[in-house]
Amino acid sequence: MEVVMPELVPIEIPPNTVMLKGLDWDSNIYFVRSGREALIVDTGTGKRARDYIGLLAGEGYLNGLREVVIFNTHEHFDHIGGNLTFKSLLEGLGIKVSFATHRIVAEIIERGLSGIILDHAYGERFKPHEVHIKLKDGDELKVGKLRLNVIHTPGHTAGSSCLYLDGDTKLMFTGDTVFNRAVGRMNLPTGSLDELRKSLRKLTGFEVDFGLPGHGWIIKDWKGNLKRVMP
């Protein structure tokens, strides 16, 4: 599988995380490996899926991998549109794939609710699919030896969630809840300013070395950034 995007460069975040910076309308994509299993956070629109998977394969990140869990932070098309293409490409490499997300988002994905997914804004039609792991606030997502905490953070959408990886390096995958110096839009279906404020206050209770947002660049001053962007 060849990479056809020379501008796409993997950004390594120690000890075992790779950031693929979203291009065009795609969300950022994150890859976290633990032994023969791995987590992928969000998949973009799908238009560049072959390039993203090709890069991961070409750089050796997929070598010896047996299983991948794809976690969607929320239901917008720029984060879930690549789900089935990622699945097909990974399964073509002999890797088992399952999908995980908050149970509110899972229902939207399984029903293919276009008015909430916003696929029409990209000139596309999302194909509904099964979600294998349906989560709620406080649940633990297990991937290899990794244990990630699910944090329900409504505001951008009702089902938006962050994933927290507590370890020597503490990571928070934020989706579109909070960016570097910005927050996600609240004027889309199921968005809420009041809920977002509550979610941001909730996130201040976590110690985070790197916030890994759905768009833009890494958040290094976690609590300072939350204070700056609080609406």
Predicted regions and their residues:
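Conserved beta-strand hairpin/beta-sheet module of binuclear metal-dependent hydrolase folds
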Residues: 6-58, 162-175
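Active-site HxH/HxHxD metal-binding segment of metal-dependent hydrolases
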Residues: 47-50, 55-140
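Short, surface-exposed connector motifs at secondary-structure boundaries
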Residues: 35-38, 62-67, 144
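Metallo-beta-lactamase
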Residues: 2-8, 12-15, 38, 45-47, 103-154, 158-229, ...
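Short, hinge-like loop/turn segments at secondary-structure boundaries
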Residues: 115-120, 190, 229-230
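Residues at the C-termini of beta-strands that transition into short coil/loop
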Residues: 21-23, 103, 136, 154, ...
